Amino acid sequence: PIGAYALGIEYGLVNWSTMLNNSPLYQKQDMVIRDEDYCRKNGLMGLSDKQLRAYPNAWRSWPRNYGGNYGDHSDIPLWNGLARSLNTIAIRVGDLVGASNIFNFVYNTLQLNTLDPVNDVGLAQMVMGSQTHGVTPTALAAAFQIFYDGQYTTPHLYTRVLDRDGNIYLENNATSYQALTPDTAYVMNRLLKNVLYSSVGTAGGRYPNSNGMESFGKTGTASDEKDLWFVGGTPYYVTAVWWGYDAPYDMTKTLGKQQAKTRTCVMAWKALMEQVQADLPYKAFPSSAGVVER
């Protein structure tokens, strides 16, 4: 959501209620996306796209949603597609925004500088996370902080160090700037709240019980369940949780598919936030006067 959805709203291309079709952006008959498994099994990997057009089964529809389905081809509102983490909806928004616009925003504005300027400028990389090297939890948490008030602050491990007399020994001057308008930040905040509070959200009901304070979040799962993610935000903190192995391993073998998808990272985040925020006074997310709510 830090790229496609956020910029779609920022540019005025989509809004909370925009209806989008829950189906692949490219159909098999469009002959745009190769079916790598079919090509590999049939010795077609070395053919050019032009040569491959002689083989209708060498192509596939794209993208699929988590679990392998291609959507039901119905029109659904944007908020619902984001809450359910539907690739079919996210890719359609990303296609409206443009992969290069998304890359420039996340690489330059949000400083996700582990991305590859040559190989990561595409919808699969920018919307579905299929990057060359990926991003770190620290960088991802820093990026999601823009859904508080639109401001980005460079990550840092300390603010200042004092000596025993109270004098400043070290000071870390972090850089802050406006990455999104407050209006866009607030709409995105409310959209991501649905992930935790809506009955259709991928982490529905798994928000921290912290003195009535609201939260927002986003689940993330690799298609092979070798990387599980959750990024959650409260009025005090943004936290990114990654669950996996140094040597990639299919975690459904030990967790089960549904548990791997929704009950690992988000539950770890929930438990952490409930402890960290236990004694903090109530705080609300800032609203934006420019957003009309009904």
Predicted feature descriptions by range:
Residues N21, V127, A240-W242:
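Soluble periplasmic/extracytoplasmic beta-strand elements of cell-envelope proteins
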Residues N87-I91, A99-F103, Q111, L115-D116, ...:
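Intrinsically disordered or highly flexible coil/loop and linker segments, enriched in small
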Residues P1-I9, I89-A90, I102, V106, ...:
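Extended, hydrophobic alpha-helical segments in both membrane/secreted and soluble proteins
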Residues F103, N108-A139:
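Primarily short, surface-exposed interaction patches in extracytoplasmic proteins
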Residues L13-I102, L123, G166-N194:
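Conserved catalytic neighborhood of penicillin-recognizing serine enzymes
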Residues R92-V93, S130, G217-K218:
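Thr-Gly-centered strand-to-loop micro-motif
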Residues I2, V14-N15, N80-R84, H133-R294:
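A penicillin-recognizing enzyme superfamily signal
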